[in-house]
UniProtKB/Swiss-Prot annotation:
Source organism per UniProt: Mus musculus
One GO term (biological process): protein catabolic process
Family: Belongs to the NLRP family.
Tissue expression: Expressed in macrophages.
UniProt KW Transcription keyword: no
Domain NACHT positions: 126-435
Localization of this protein: Cytoplasm; Cytoplasm, Cytosol
Name of the gene this protein is made from: Nlrp1b
Domain of life: Eukaryota
Lineage, top ranks: Eukaryota, Metazoa, Chordata, Craniata, Vertebrata
Region described as Disordered: spans on this chain: 1-22
The protein, known as: NACHT, LRR and PYD domains-containing protein 1b allele 4
Length: 906
């Protein structure tokens, strides 16, 4: 802690050993970039070699060297999601899919807004919890807050004193007084303790890694007011501070993994939750320039990673980005050709081991290191003494090697050792589980012990969220086993690894919807057989039976999943392809409704911006679609480059997508050349939906060129014809005549309506009218219109009688079944008949019945008039998506109001 010092510039220092690089990404890059465009051109022309001789380079900077003039600039683009506190803390961690539309998760904020008014309450929070996945950058953010305050750029008016504590170091202390705690949070004593405590509302305590120690932060005695000099157990002192027994006016900033939130939220008063989402956009590239002091090396490394969408997505996690840079730098120093084909974090860690640890240490010393890591994970320890290292059999030579390579690091404030990152410790712990289990003398008992230890450490509900478990899945995959056998010169029996995986799967919480954590584990494993088997077994918890699918009004065939990051998007789309009961994938920004209303599908929601990188990884995974047949991107505004990438995917031989929805995506005539290239290729696409886009005559003519190609497989094309010229419509009609398999439609697609209890009784009618008006009311004469009824003789035009009354008339020419896709109405008639259809307001009738007290309006009201006896059946449309999956068709009533005022409800 320091008190309002003047701004001062800091110096850049080089780490003592080549691998001891701070994972913090906060130092200003003191590098001139004026030659970068030239270097990029040289790289593209092959003028700069990719094979490197060993060179001495400056190592990645410690956090202390951050230059203040660029500090806030680092914060500006850091993706932070401020969240609403969940009503049910039990379910706050699990990101599982469900049958209802998920509630909005919050909104994006800047670092300056951490202590601003909270969502909903509009009150400034005293407690802010920074949460996020392992290695996502929470500690870095916490250090940056302290540093920015010190440099006078952040919260200077808000706080007079800021204290930073590493909880892993605090855990080494048994007892502390408040005065001693504050002294530990100061780099240099700046004021007497009485003066500091005189204004508690000006104090900020930053507790980094509050979840790491095995603490129970309970306020032991809320009524007890201790003197600042009285010593007590550290966890009791922190519990009293957080419980507001001590310094109730003080402010707190906590960092924790998302999976640990459950044990904090119920006991903490009104916390503001902020999730760190990792690197975004330009930050990936910036990190490479911060890591590599040599500009040429930075450009070469980044361009190699940028060409691999999977590797680039993995770099969204700062810790993984460090891992990638470290591997590439090792290859440069060893004079190797740059090559990094890893598809998972586990594979990257194995690559890191092979490049970092000398062969002579792998068999014995690395095993000892793994045992040390595992013991620490089970006992919630991240700091180790020299005696701990000796106890595991680590000799001085090995420890020196691990320090030099950066696997271990020595704490400057003590004689303790730690792994370079907690994730790295968890990786070594996972290796320890497998190496121990591979010993024949242990057998099933050892396997049971390992799984029970994992459950005890992480809990059943969060088992798949634990990095150690994810690493286990990765190491037990085919590539993981191959890598371990090569590294440790051992053989891992196939039966053993399969048994361990199924033990873990069997110990997870039963009858729970599948969560993103499980998908992460399956992604790390990459075993096609396991993926197919597990995703098939999820049928009972995900997919309803055939009867439910038939009742599309209930939307039980739709599963919703929120993906906030590109990493989550990559994992979800990769795994969903192996789920044979989902045929369509839909990506929605916020709560924009899609248009694929019938096929069983998975809807991915995203409250955070969808970037070019997001689209790239989505389309990359769809190159091999397996079970997926449809893709619905309706409602998302698509840039030209995005559609270009999509079309490249559709032309890929492994892509088997048959149906594509691009309704209301902001497409213009410029995009049609891209779509035409897909139609001209031998693609699997058979249905294309392009309504509510401004394609124009020129755009549709380009589509016609693609449709004329003999290899075009398209059979259904949906367009808006009302804005097209008669000449273009004639071209479309000619195409249909020449190709009997081609069916061109111009229909209005109704949105689903989500009823709420406070919905006005005429709201649905208003919405229904507005949606119809978007398509235009003027009937078309060619190819059918939004208002046509389709029957035995083809389309039958609908006549607008009275626009004010919303009264329409249709003359059905003969007996048969007639269906209007626009409204959803369906008539069965015995003879030629004229039918009048009027859209009415529910208030005209509901006010006279008790129904308005017990039921909600969930669909439109029609006044249908026809000659008696001519109409034998009327099928009404449904426009409802239920929030509660427990509802059934018995909860619905179709009400008929007869001429004399009576009603019939069933």
């Amino acid at each position: 802690m320091e008190e309002s010092p003047p701004k001062q510039k800091s110096n850049t220092k080089v780490a003592q050993h080549e691998g001891q690089q701070d994972l913090n990404t906060t130092r200003h890059m003191n590098v001139e970039l004026k030659h970068r465009p030239k270097l990029e051109r040289h790289l593209k022309l092959g003028m700069i070699p990719v094979v490197y001789m060993k060179q001495r380079e400056e190592i990645l900077y410690p956090a202390q060297s951050l230059k203040e003039e660029n500090l806030i600039q680092n914060f500006t683009s850091l993706p932070l999601l401020q969240k609403l506190c969940p009503k049910d803390p039990e379910n706050m961690v699990r990101k599982s899919w469900a049958s209802c539309i998920p509630e909005e998760g919050g909104h994006m904020i800047n670092i300056q807004d951490l202590f601003g008014p909270n969502i909903g309450t509009q009150k400034e929070p005293q407690l802010v919890i920074i949460e996020g996945a392992a290695g996502i950058g929470k500690s870095t953010l916490a250090r940056l807050v302290k540093r920015a305050w010190k440099e006078g750029q952040l919260y200077r008016d808000h706080f007079q004193h800021v204290f930073f504590f590493s909880c892993r170091e605090l855990a080494q202390c048994k007892k502390l007084s408040l005065a001693e705690l504050i002294a530990q949070g100061q780099e240099v004593p700046t004021a007497p303790i009485n003066q500091i405590l005189s204004h508690p509302e000006k104090l900020l305590f930053i507790l980094d890694g509050i979840d790491e120690p095995a603490w129970v932060l309970a306020d032991q005695n809320p009524e007890l007011c201790l003197h600042w000099s009285q010593r007590q157990p550290v966890h009791t002192l922190l519990g009293s501070l957080l419980g507001k027994s001590i310094l109730p006016e003080a402010f707190f900033l906590l960092t924790t993994r998302t999976t640990a939130l459950q044990k904090f939220i119920p006991s903490l008063p009104m916390p503001c939750q902020v999730e760190v989402l990792g690197f975004s956009g330009i930050e990936w590239e910036n990190y490479f320039y911060k890591y590599f002091a040599n500009q040429r090396h930075a450009i070469t490394a980044f361009m190699m990673v940028e060409s691999n969408p999977v590797l680039l997505t993995l770099c969204e996690v700062p810790w993984v980005c460090w891992l990638v840079c470290t591997c590439l730098k090792k290859q440069m120093k060893q004079g190797r050709v740059l090559s990094l084909k890893s598809q998972t974090t586990t594979a990257l860690c194995l690559k890191y081991l092979s490049l970092t640890i000398p062969d002579k240490h792998r068999r014995t010393q690395v095993k000892a290191l793994c045992s040390l890591a595992a013991e620490g994970i089970w006992k919630r320890r991240t700091l180790f003494s020299e005696s701990d290292l000796c106890k595991q059999g680590l000799d001085e030579d090995a420890v020196a090697t691990f320090l030099k390579t950066g696997v271990l690091q020595k704490q400057a404030s003590s004689l303790s050792y730690s792994f370079a990152h907690l994730c790295l410790q968890e990786f070594f712990a996972a290796i320890s589980c497998i190496l121990e289990d591979s010993e024949e003398r242990h057998g099933n008992m050892e396997m049971d012990r390992i799984v029970e230890t994992l459950v005890e450490r992480y809990g059943r509900q969060n088992l798949f969220e634990a990095p150690t478990v994810r690493f286990l899945f990765g190491l037990l995959g085919k590539e993981g086993v191959k890598g371990m056998e090569k590294l440790f010169s051992c053989s891992l029996p196939g039966k053993t690894k399969l048994k361990l995986l199924w033990h873990i799967l069997g110990k997870s919480q039963p009858h729970q919807p599948p969560c993103l954590g499980l998908l992460h584990c399956l992604y790390e494993n990459q075993d096609m057989e396991l993926l197919t088997h597990v995703m098939h077994d999820l049928q009972g918890t995900i997919v309803p039976g055939p009867n439910d699918i038939a009742h599309t009004v209930l939307q039980t065939n739709v599963k919703q999943l929120v993906v906030q990051t590109d990493m989550e998007l990559m994992v979800a789309t990769f795994c969903i392809q192996f789920y044979c009961h989902v045929r369509t994938l839909q990506l929605n920004m916020e709560k924009q409704q899609g248009y694929a209303l019938t096929s069983p599908r998975m809807v991915l929601y995203r409250w955070t911006p969808i970037t070019n990188a997001s689209w790239e990884i989505l389309f990359y995974n769809l190159k091999f679609t397996r079970n997926l047949e449809g893709l619905d991107l309706s409602g998302n505004s698509l840039r030209y480059s995005v559609v270009q990438s999509l079309c490249n995917t559709l032309r890929y031989p492994g892509c088997q997508l048959k149906t594509l929805w691009l309704v209301k995506c902001g497409l213009t005539s410029r995009y049609c050349s891209l779509l035409a290239s897909v139609l001209s290729a031998h693609s699997s696409l058979t249905e294309l939906y392009l309504q509510l886009n401004d394609l124009g005559d020129d755009g549709v003519r380009m589509l016609c060129e693609g449709l004329r190609n003999p290899v075009c497989n398209l059979s259904i094309l949906w367009l808006d014809l009302s804005s097209l010229s008669a000449q273009v419509i004639t071209e479309l009609r000619t195409l249909e005549e020449k190709n009997p398999k081609l069916y061109i439609r111009s229909i209005w697609m109704p949105h689903m309506m989500v009823p709420t209890e406070n919905m006005d009784e005429e709201a649905i009618l208003t919405t229904f009218k507005q949606q119809r008006q978007e398509s235009g009311d003027k009937p078309m004469e060619i190819l059918g219109t939004e208002e046509d009824f389709w029957g035995p003789t083809g389309p039958v035009a609908t006549e607008l009688v009275d626009r004010v009354r919303n009264l329409y008339r249709v003359q059905l020419p003969m007996a048969g079944s007639y269906h209007c896709p626009s409204t959803g109405l369906h008539f069965v008639v015995t003879r030629a008949v004229t039918i009048e259809i009027e859209f009415c307001a529910w208030s005209q009738f509901l006010d006279k019945t008790p129904l308005q007290q017990s039921h909600m309006v969930v669909g439109p009201l029609f006044d249908i008039k026809a000659e008696q006896g001519a109409v034998t059946a009327v099928y009404l449309p449904h426009f409802v998506s239920l929030k509660d999956t427990e509802a059934s068709t018995f909860d619905f009533k179709v009400t008929h109001f007869q001429e004399h005022g009576s009603r019939n409800a069933r």
